[in-house]
Amino acid sequence: MSASLARLERKLGYTFKDQDQMVLALTHRSYAGRNNERLEFLGDAILNFVAGEALFERFPQAREGQLSRLRARLVKGETLARLARGFDLGEYLRLGSGELKSGGFRRESILADALEALIGAIYLDADMQTARERVLAWLTDEFESLTLVDTNKDPKTRLQEFLQSRSCELPRYEVVDIQGEPHCRTFFVECEVVLLNNKSRGQGVSRRIAEQVAAAAALIALGVENGND
């Protein structure tokens, strides 16, 4: 095993029995051969479960929608990339030449995906309990900073954070109609989200309110909220 990978293991707090799993987790799809996308898929599922379970226990009075919002904050790409930078993960990534030249080792989405892949690799190399322990250890500071006050955000912010947690494009809002007299207008807005086949709609006495209504409708359509939270 190379000295550099041993350094990374110390930072992660886990020593791999099968070094190939670790190397694969660090291999971006731009690199020739097998890549970390399957491990990323697995790690994402484990991360969401572990975070959800921990929040369920930590906030016994929280409603479903509140728990979903807190989890979205924990697992969003920005958070994962920040953790990855703390491990200097970019130094260990295997990238294709083009991705390397364009600075892919600094890119938020690549760092976040690699961290999820490492979670999946740890699970396969050890077991669920070990993967859970690592995830909770890495997210300790994030968990400590969370309160239910964090769920009192407007729908647009909640939608943005949810999409960021899935490494998706941000929603696009468009005013499709304005009705009424200048002193009493009603704005009609559509919100386009890549995860939804249909645009969500909202209306209100201002563009801002209409966008918030459309964002709330998108959250319900995504199954993130049920309309009662």
UniProtKB/Swiss-Prot annotation:
It catalyses: Endonucleolytic cleavage to 5'-phosphomonoester. One of its GO terms (cellular component) is cytoplasm. Residues 154-224 form the DRBM domain. CDD domains: DSRM_RNAse_III_family (cd10845), RIBOc (cd00593). GO terms for molecular function: double-stranded RNA binding; metal ion binding; ribonuclease III activity; rRNA binding. Transmembrane segments: none annotated. Pfam families: dsrm, Ribonucleas_3_3. GO terms for biological process: mRNA processing; regulation of gene expression; rRNA processing; tRNA processing. Belongs to the ribonuclease III family. Digests double-stranded RNA. Involved in the processing of primary rRNA transcript to yield the immediate precursors to the large and small rRNAs (23S and 16S). Processes some mRNAs, and tRNAs when they are encoded in the rRNA operon. Processes pre-crRNA and tracrRNA of type II CRISPR loci if present in the organism. This is Ribonuclease 3. It comes from Pseudomonas putida (strain W619).
